[in-house]
Amino acid sequence: MEAFAVAIQSVINDSGFLAFTTYNAIMILVGLILLYLAFAREFEPLLLGPIAFGCVLANIPRNGFEEGVMALISAGISQEIFPPLIFLGVGAMTDFGPLIANPKTLLLGAAAQIGVFVALGGAMMLGFTAQEAAAIGIIGGADGPTSIYLATKLAPHLLGAIAVAAYSYMSLVPLIQPPVMKLFTTQKEREIVMEQLREVTRFEKIVFPIVATIFISLLLPSITSLLGMLMLGNLFRESGVTDRLSDTSQNALINTVTIFLATGTGLTMSAEHFLSLETIKIILLGLFAFICGTAGGVLFGKLMSLVDGGKTNPLIGSAGVSAVPMAARVSQVVGAKANPANFLLMHAMGPNVAGVIGTAVAAGTMLAMLSNH
């Protein structure tokens, strides 16, 4: 009987209830709210769902996650394994044809990155270090894997807040972008019908990822792992002889890695790291960055329309953020409401895929500037 009592006492002493705090309860509530948004409201459920559940797990006291499979999942993020693998799948799902057919849309993808650098300056004004500000600013590119990659390198203690902000704003693209697009364009500009894009050859689609990888990687070696995997996935897609690799990359692989990446991100959302004034600042700065990025793309689209005599609909500029393909769909929806004869989707895909490259380049630029500081 005494042995039984000792065993019961041991279970009680090891119980998480004894170490459970109000802060743990608050973070578990945050996780449950995110689960509701993911599954009931369908806000980026494939990503926000695992992140939310990881948040719940991270706030169970004495969870023993320092070893075992959870430690391996965390290592996949800290050792920068998962983001490049996500990019492999993204590359296999991406068609660079609209960008190749209309190369000037690359400039729209670049213009949309203004939000990244505006937010960087704003974050530094609010007291964040240069490294922290850079990691926060990249939220404006609306690219979750790149945000995680840069945060891991420059501000790992802010990873949870940055990832949640990035994926939240990606899911809210249809709500955030239209008011900004309408604010900076006239009805006449939104009604512009663009000419059909030319057909892109298979040779062009194969050469593009090779040339882009070599040139950009030589310019910014720090993003070679991200960009290289993106373009390798695209080569699988376009080569015509690696269908099995392409299918695996854009289905089984990316789905599996998404589970680990999102869950691992949630595991960083422990109360001691997440419950702070900095988290609120990060969420607000991320929203500001995303709005500025959308505005930057639209304003550059207006300039492009002015230069080419009204052949470019400025609405496609908002797709310069790298939320693929949601941002391009928003351009299509807003354009079609202004003019039912408008079909902007393929035109918007040009700046949209350019935004993926642009956000990676912005991340590489900041890494080159700050990694040694």
Predicted regions and their residues:
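Membrane-embedded hairpin module used as a gating/binding unit in multi-pass transport
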Residues: S168-V241
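Interfacial helix-loop-helix linkers and transmembrane-helix boundary segments
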Residues: F39-L48, V69-I73, M93-L108, T242-N251, ...
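Transmembrane helical segments that form the transport core of multi-pass membrane transport proteins
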Residues: T213-F300
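Hydrophobic transmembrane alpha-helices of multi-pass solute/ion transporters
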Residues: V6-A19, L37-R41, F53-I81, L235-T256, ...
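Transmembrane alpha-helix boundary signature
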Residues: N59-L72, L88-I100, G122-Q131, E272
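Entry/N-cap segments of selected transmembrane alpha helices
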Residues: L99-L120, A271-G297, A348-N352
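Alpha-helical transmembrane segments
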Residues: H157-L175, L285-G293, I316-A319
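Alpha-helical membrane segments and immediately flanking helix-loop junctions
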Residues: A75, Q79-E80, L88-M93, L108-V118, ...
